[in-house]
Amino acid sequence: MLKIEKSSEIKRENGVLMSKCTANVPGSPMSVYSFNVDGILIDTGSSSLLEEFKPYFNEADFDAIYITHFHEDHIGNVAYLQNQRDVPAFIHSSSTSFTPKPFRIPTYRQIVWGESAPFSSTALDETFTSRNHTWEVIETPGHTKDHVTFYNRDLGAMFTGDLFVSPKVKVVLTEENILDTRRSLQKIEAYDFEDMYCCHAGYVKNAKEWIRLKIEYIDELEGKVLTLSKQGKDIYEITAELFPKPYPIIAVSNTEWSPVHMVRTILNRG
């Protein structure tokens, strides 16, 4: 049986209360964040880390939950919080029909993140108002089709879910579209903000510099893939040349996570 040690920490940056909880999978610690600001909770972490998140949930002051996308490490504790506080949860309109149903995921994801109980949800509008601020809901597909980013102009902050994660991503989910991710990064880059709150990287200062690095990385990757394709190499040869490292998650997930999905998207040109 895989032993997973867990840890948590709570901190505050620029008026944003946040909790980082980690599932320490051997050789690959996996962290996820939840954010609390101006009476709203942004993403709820995974059900497997509920006990670690509870001190933060107890400290957090919120009247509503806003979800960046329908994945188990973001929706995992919505049902618990609704049972505790009877608060509404808002998510992309394409996902509201799924939230009242059991969410089935592969076994390896169940082991790390746990299963998510059904919950009630309401479709996001283009904007919403918290206690003191008006927020913009920005469509940012790529990681998932339903992915959104929450922008607070007053705070100069973007809450980006899983849009950023890291500047040089090596593996992605089979459903991801790396070219849509680039378009979404370019979209938010045009906004006026300084800070980014990422559900896996946490609080990111000088956000636009990091966003630009990821855009340039995808540009470079696209160029390399297309060059190798013109040389007659197929998708698997290209993947092996550009990503020779056998990341454990590839085998563990039976290639649900793999660099081949980025290469395929580029060859199909999005």
Language-model regions, residue ranges each:
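Residue-level signal for the nucleotide or nucleotide-sugar donor/cofactor binding architecture
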Residues: 76, 135, 176
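Accessory terminal helices/loops
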Residues: 1-3, 190-191, 195, 204-270
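Active-site HxH/HxHxD metal-binding segment of metal-dependent hydrolases
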Residues: 51-130, 216
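Active-site neighborhood of phospho(di)ester-bond hydrolases with catalytic His/Asp-centered motifs
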Residues: 42-45, 63-71, 89-93, 139-142, ...
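Metallo-beta-lactamase
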Residues: 2, 10-13, 94-141, 144-224, ...
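Conserved beta-strand hairpin/beta-sheet module of binuclear metal-dependent hydrolase folds
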Residues: 2-60, 149-161
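Short, basic, glycine/proline-bearing loop/turn elements
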Residues: 39, 132-133, 167-171
